[in-house]
Amino acid sequence: MAKLDTAALNQLFTQARTRNGWSDQPIPEAVLRELYDLVKFGPTAANTTPARFVFVQSPEAKARLAALSSGSNGPKILQAPVTVIVGYDLDFPETLDKLFPNAPGAKNWFGDPVAKEVGALRNSSLQGGYFILAARALGLDVGPMSGFDNAGVDKEFFAGTNIKSNFIASIGYGTEEGLFPRNPRLDFEEAARII
């Protein structure tokens, strides 16, 4: 595998910013499908892929989601062309015969409710990270948020399922509006060690 060039690394990491303001340029459905088709190839434990994505795009759906958000997140949701709800499906073990066929009975690994919840949350979080990087790779800006009513979102958008919300993220073409100076990050010595 070859190292990405500096321009690609800048776009994915060092120059990318969390956006709070959005242009009114729409995101075509084909781009949303392309985005998912990249995300689905990111690795998860035993190929569990428990994340489920709801692309909130219509004015009516955005208003419903904004009403369940905290503080300044509502206006961001209303302004962005799309906000995705990244959820996790607690019924994910039922897909493992298809997704992990080299281990028949793999769904039994997640028979314990705690193991199922932990596995679903952990691996959907991985997929959420892949989502952010895939969106940036396609030229989209991203504004992830965790300030919202999880139970309310679950009732409003996942009723009748065993899916729970993890986090939300607005996507689109960002503006400089509300863009804060880049905050510091921890240095290697503060966050990592080699043993």
UniProtKB/Swiss-Prot annotation:
InterPro entries (UniProt xref): Nitroreductase (IPR029479), Nitroreductase-like (IPR000415), Nitroreductase_HadB/RutE (IPR050461), RutE-like (IPR023936)
UniProt KW keywords: Flavoprotein, FMN, NAD, NADP, Oxidoreductase
CDD domains xrefs: RutE-like
This enzyme's EC code(s): 1.-.-.-
Cofactor(s), names only, from the UniProt record: FMN
Any GO molecular function: oxidoreductase activity
Superkingdom as given in the UniProt entry: Bacteria
Matches recorded under Gene3D superfamilies: NADH Oxidase (3.40.109.10)
Name of the top EC class for this enzyme: oxidoreductase
Name the UniProt record assigns to this protein: Putative NADH dehydrogenase/NAD(P)H nitroreductase Caul_0018
Organism: Caulobacter sp. (strain K31)
